[in-house]
Amino acid sequence: MGKYFGTDGVRGVANSELTPELAFRLGRMGGYVLTRHVGEHPRVLVARDTRISGEMLESALIAGLVSVGIEVMRLGVISTPGVAYLTKAQGASASVMISASHNPVDDNGIKFFGSDGFKLSDDQEEEIEQLLDTAEDTLPRPSGEGLGTVSDYFEGKQKYIQYLKQTIENDFNGYHIALDCANGATSGLATHLFADLDAEISSMGASPNGLNINDGVGSTHPEALAAFVLDKKADVGLAFDGDGDRVIAIDEIGQIVDGDKIMFICAKYLREQGLLNSNTIVSTVMSNLGFYKGLRELEIEDVQTAVGDRYVVEAMREGNYNLGGEQSGHIIFLDHNTTGDGLLSGIQLINVMKATGKKLSELASEMKTFPQKLENIRVSDKNHVTDNPKVSKVISEVEAEMAGNGRVLVRPSGTEPLVRVMVEAATKEETDEYCERISAVVRSEMALND
């Protein structure tokens, strides 16, 4: 990770770390790097989620883009994968999404996509960072007709919805689907999509006010949707995050179906249809041991990457694989989109339910999970967790006690000032004890003082 760019663009507290001034410079520098070879007036799409800071940052970013001669098309509020799809569909030179995904409302972020709809390479991000750190801005400053322009393309949302519908062979007539839109970017999109697919819909977390994004709702709070599914007697629930690139499902009896299980269900179905490229799925080190055991039983190969959907996508492109993702709900169907897409993943999952005639609880039960616990600890310097001797010592002690019947993963978050402690073991009691033992040392050594 660089000085500005993390694993998912530039993020920080809006108007404090991610300021309008920085957004303006990102517009100039990022726009220049991505469009300088295009010719006159390249086109760049700009979108945002529902955060109160979104319009402020959007205005500054667009000013920067226009100042280097770029034609900006505003999409308004739309999901990150919607932007990625429309970039390629509209023949744009690049696009920018203003969002901090599942982070709290105080945060915001800016991420770029190239003309192919994929996130930027490390080299491209490094070039933008070098320009940001240059003392004097020497980029072109056109005037008159050389300046860029701004127009609206709000109908892009409907084009994206129509595309999603074409990726499945079934409608959802007869299904009652509960939706939790995290008061974020899918709030209008999801209900429109599932209504078009003839489903009965109950929705929550679909009334954004600029301040309530991810607030007790969405994919990071699936327990809220679980209760809602039971209350509404729905067949399935789908919880998205703030920018719509993740989904966590809930089955008809209120059980959480995470990204591992969604990938497992879809991989099995695609394999049966002869559509799983190289009979392989790409996942990260966070996936449950039970996920890999289940894949082996199905004779499906797996490729494992570092945490972060960008690394999953890189491995998928390198190996020409078409399914991959993360336990957190970032799932990539590379035949259909270039990034994690909550809406796409949700309709693919329900399409499997309809095609097989099985309830989600039946499909999910085919993968047995190891007990797993994840603790997120807010720290002063997350990157020092890897070289802290006391943390290393307690990890080694726990791993020795496990004797191969479990695993430990302690790592810095790529998007927040957190250390994540993940433990899997043979029993829930062991998992809880090991996780708390390691977490206590991390807190003692590194945690911020409240």
Swiss-Prot record:
An example Gene Ontology CC term for this record: cytosol
PANTHER family attached to this UniProt entry: PHOSPHOGLUCOMUTASE (ALPHA-D-GLUCOSE-1,6-BISPHOSPHATE-DEPENDENT), PHOSPHOHEXOSE MUTASE
Catalyzed reactions per annotation: alpha-D-glucosamine 1-phosphate = D-glucosamine 6-phosphate
Cofactor(s) needed for function: Mg(2+)
Active-site residues per Swiss-Prot or TrEMBL entry: 101 (phosphoserine intermediate)
Binding site for Mg(2+): 101, 241, 243, 245
E.C. no: 5.4.2.10
Family from the record: Belongs to the phosphohexose mutase family.
The gene coding this protein: glmM
Entry comment on modification after translation: Activated by phosphorylation.
The protein, known as: Phosphoglucosamine mutase
Positions of transmembrane segments: none
One of the record's GO molecular function terms: phosphomannomutase activity
Pfam families: PGM_PMM_I, PGM_PMM_II, PGM_PMM_III, PGM_PMM_IV
Listed InterPro entries: A-D-PHexomutase_a/b/a-I, A-D-PHexomutase_a/b/a-I/II/III, A-D-PHexomutase_a/b/a-II, A-D-PHexomutase_a/b/a-III, A-D-PHexomutase_C, A-D-PHexomutase_C_sf, A-D-PHexomutase_CS, Alpha-D-phosphohexomutase_SF
Organism: Listeria welshimeri serovar 6b (strain ATCC 35897 / DSM 20650 / CCUG 15529 / CIP 8149 / NCTC 11857 / SLCC 5334 / V8)
Modified-residue entries (Phosphoserine), positions: 101
An example Gene Ontology biological process: UDP-N-acetylglucosamine biosynthetic process
Record's cofactor remark: Binds 1 Mg(2+) ion per subunit.
SUPFAM superfamilies membership: Phosphoglucomutase, C-terminal domain, Phosphoglucomutase, first 3 domains
Function: Catalyzes the conversion of glucosamine-6-phosphate to glucosamine-1-phosphate.
Keywords, sorted A to Z: Isomerase, Magnesium, Metal-binding, Phosphoprotein
